[in-house]
Curated annotation (Swiss-Prot):
<keyword id="KW-0378">Hydrolase</keyword>
<feature type="active site" description="Proton donor">
    <location>
        <position position="196"/>
    </location>
</feature>
<feature type="active site" description="Proton acceptor">
    <location>
        <position position="11"/>
    </location>
</feature>
<dbReference type="GO" id="GO:0005829">
    <property type="term" value="C:cytosol"/>
</dbReference>
<dbReference type="Pfam" id="PF01048">
    <property type="entry name" value="PNP_UDP_1"/>
</dbReference>
<keyword id="KW-0486">Methionine biosynthesis</keyword>
<protein>
    <recommendedName>
        <fullName>5'-methylthioadenosine/S-adenosylhomocysteine nucleosidase</fullName>
        <ecNumber>3.2.2.9</ecNumber>
    </recommendedName>
</protein>
<dbReference type="InterPro" id="IPR035994">
    <property type="entry name" value="Nucleoside_phosphorylase_sf"/>
</dbReference>
<feature type="binding site">
    <location>
        <begin position="172"/>
        <end position="173"/>
    </location>
    <ligand>
        <name>substrate</name>
    </ligand>
</feature>
<dbReference type="InterPro" id="IPR010049">
    <property type="entry name" value="MTA_SAH_Nsdase"/>
</dbReference>
<comment type="function">
    <text>Catalyzes the irreversible cleavage of the glycosidic bond in both 5'-methylthioadenosine (MTA) and S-adenosylhomocysteine (SAH/AdoHcy) to adenine and the corresponding thioribose, 5'-methylthioribose and S-ribosylhomocysteine, respectively. Also cleaves 5'-deoxyadenosine, a toxic by-product of radical S-adenosylmethionine (SAM) enzymes, into 5-deoxyribose and adenine.</text>
</comment>
<dbReference type="GO" id="GO:0008782">
    <property type="term" value="F:adenosylhomocysteine nucleosidase activity"/>
</dbReference>
<comment type="pathway">
    <text>Amino-acid biosynthesis; L-methionine biosynthesis via salvage pathway; S-methyl-5-thio-alpha-D-ribose 1-phosphate from S-methyl-5'-thioadenosine (hydrolase route): step 1/2.</text>
</comment>
<dbReference type="InterPro" id="IPR000845">
    <property type="entry name" value="Nucleoside_phosphorylase_d"/>
</dbReference>
<feature type="binding site">
    <location>
        <position position="77"/>
    </location>
    <ligand>
        <name>substrate</name>
    </ligand>
</feature>
<feature type="binding site">
    <location>
        <position position="151"/>
    </location>
    <ligand>
        <name>substrate</name>
    </ligand>
</feature>
<comment type="similarity">
    <text>Belongs to the PNP/UDP phosphorylase family. MtnN subfamily.</text>
</comment>
Length: 228
């Protein structure tokens, strides 16, 4: 079984409409959509926004449905200047940009007793790249950073780039999903479409281009599931 997680309704609606033999299951105020997509058994959920919401949803998904892997779909703000709205970013690793336990000898972004970064599954990365190349999307792979703030000012963006110069994009859930998968020893991949440029116009751009980003990220997941 393939687990699929998106934070917002727009990020899961397209995939939900493609699922056949759909069964809707409610667990602890989290809605799960179970069925088949490209003849693969899938379980899809809209987790809600932020690290705690998505950690709860991911844990419920894993404990209740026992997926073989997790795919995270959705949108992100670009931190790398080579990325534009509608482009695709595939994580090779993820990290928190808002965790700081350096007083105890940990790296910036590292949760105590956890890795500094969480590494995505290499096989899933290759499959995602193949799916992207088939459709000729503009895509990059690299570090995605997560935190419980929407990055909507130039100052926020500059702070993250200072602390994490390799970061390609920022969003609010991916690293919490990755940490949960790490705890359960489950492979994961993060695929995000760029909805904004994480700058002073990010709020306006996000609202305008969320649908475009949702379509692009859903298409990537759809193609990826075909190849798994």
């Amino acid at each position: 079984m393939i687990g699929i997680i998106g934070a917002m309704e727009e990020e899961v609606a397209i995939l939900k409409d493609k699922i056949v033999n759909l069964e809707i299951i409610n667990v602890a105020h989290v809605v799960f959509y179970k069925g088949r997509l490209h003849d693969k058994e899938v379980i899809l959920t809209q987790s809600g926004i932020g690290k705690v919401n998505v950690a709860i949803s991911t844990t419920l998904l894993i404990n209740r449905f026992h997926p073989d892997l997790i795919i995270n779909t959705g949108s992100a703000g670009a931190l790398d200047k080579s990325l534009g709205v509608g482009d695709i970013i595939v994580s090779d690793m993820v990290a928190y940009h808002d965790a700081d336990a350096r007083a105890f000898g940990y790296q910036l972004g590292q949760i105590p007793q956890m890795p500094a970064q969480f590494v995505a599954d290499s096989h899933l990365i290759e499959l995602a790249k193949e799916a992207i190349n088939d459709q000729k999307w503009v895509a990059k792979s690299g570090l995605i950073v997560s935190g419980d703030s929407f990055i909507g000012t130039a100052e926020q963006r500059a702070d993250i780039k200072t602390n994490f110069p390799q970061a390609m994009a920022a969003e609010m859930e991916a690293t919490a999903i990755a940490q949960t998968c790490y705890q359960f020893n489950l492979p994961f991949i993060i695929t995000r479409a760029i909805s904004d440029l994480a700058d002073g116009d990010a709020g306006i751009t996000f609202e305008a281009f969320l649908e475009k980003a949702a379509i692009a990220s859903s298409q990537i997941v759809d193609r990826l599931i075909k190849t798994i």
